[in-house]
Amino acid sequence: MLELLFLLLPVAAAYGWYMGRRSAQQNKQDEANRLSRDYVAGVNFLLSNQQDKAVDLFLDMLKEDTGTVEAHLTLGNLFRSRGEVDRAIRIHQTLMESASLTYEQRLLAIQQLGRDYMAAGLYDRAEDMFNQLTDETDFRIGALQQLLQIYQATSEWQKAIDVAERLVKLGKDKQRVEIAHFYCELALQHMASDDLDRAMTLLKKGAAADKNSARVSIMMGRVFMAKGEYAKAVESLQRVISQDRELVSETLEMLQTCYQQLGKTAEWAEFLQRAVEENTGADAELMLADIIEARDGSEAAQVYITRQLQRHPTMRVFHKLMDYHLNEAEEGRAKESLMVLRDMVGEKVRSKPRYRCQKCGFTAYTLYWHCPSCRAWSTIKPIRGLDGL
């Protein structure tokens, strides 16, 4: 109850100020006193958990005196913040339908009703509300941002692109990153139906929106591979190392396939060496170790792995080093113990999440471009360090 009382303090202050000003007018003193008593009665209903009676009383007061609009807007927002969305909708809907509101007040009511519908998951109704505000100077950016949330929630990617492009024109350049992702989402739909040409057209638009989009480059690489154009796939996938080196590990298996198809094993080793030098993660180190072992022998690979473990210690590289030691160990209890230890390390590596959102900390075993927790784009990266990649 005390929590609710504190939540009501802004409403009481606003209404008290208003009633004090109105009460100064002697000819309306009686009316002010009656409305003040009604307001206190409404608060009492709230404090006694009779919220519906309180809402009815406040709405009746609104019909008699539109000077309480701001107080009612605040009250509706309080209900929404407490999860009582139905009551918030009742209040804001009644406000919006009131014939005595000023133009500005009506826009405020529409805005808050749209947020109520968003909170209730009624996206079609919320969309209708915010569309009414997109041509209003003081409400335009906020309404477009709300619409952008709606279209992402409903996977209406072309609408999301249209809204985001309007925001870019209004100075919100950060939306370019999201626009590239929206084009990628559309491209995925066409890739699923084997319409690779249309998918590539969409990806090029994504690249135009954000030239640093690693996701666009990775998806272009996949499309080129599907079309058998391995040289172009290599060109696209290699761009990632300059766009976002933390995501290079997502390209390595595809690049390995492309270089094999092209018969360019030396160039593949050179790229891995570059990836290792730029500290892109354990995947590149382990792949290069395999090449060194095949070319120069197990001992050379072990020396290389030991050096990398000293520079950038990770459990995955340590697990690889244990494999080399096991291959050299003589049969006996020492080797058996080493095998147990290696298996324990391997299980730990497999059980650890591979990715983490840099914004909210959400962890996952697969890469998400759109964080399921905080809904941010491009914030999930491979985990680095001892337990990471």
Swiss-Prot record:
Pfam families: TPR_19, TPR_7, Zn_ribbon_LapB
GO MF terms held by the record: iron ion binding
Keyword Transmembrane helix: yes
Subcellular location: Cell inner membrane
TPR repeat copies, ranges: 35-68, 69-102, 107-140, 142-174, 180-213, 214-247, 249-282
A single GO BP: lipopolysaccharide metabolic process
TM spans (from-to): 1-20
Keywords on record: Cell inner membrane, Cell membrane, Iron, Membrane, Metal-binding, Repeat, TPR repeat, Transmembrane, Transmembrane helix
Topology versus the membrane: Single-pass membrane protein
Gene3D superfamilies to which the protein is assigned, alphabetical: Tetratricopeptide repeat domain (1.25.40.10)
Cytoplasmic topology ranges: 21-389
One GO cellular component term: cytoplasmic side of plasma membrane
Xref: InterPro entries: CellSynth/LPSAsmb/PSIAsmb, LapB, Rubredoxin_2, TPR-like_helical_dom_sf, TPR_rpt
Chain sites annotated for binding Fe cation: 357, 360, 371, 374
PANTHER family in the cross-refs: LIPOPOLYSACCHARIDE ASSEMBLY PROTEIN B, TPR REPEAT-CONTAINING PROTEIN PA4667
Primary role: Modulates cellular lipopolysaccharide (LPS) levels by regulating LpxC, which is involved in lipid A biosynthesis. May act by modulating the proteolytic activity of FtsH towards LpxC. May also coordinate assembly of proteins involved in LPS synthesis at the plasma membrane.
Family: Belongs to the LapB family.
Protein name: Lipopolysaccharide assembly protein B
Organism field: Escherichia coli O157:H7
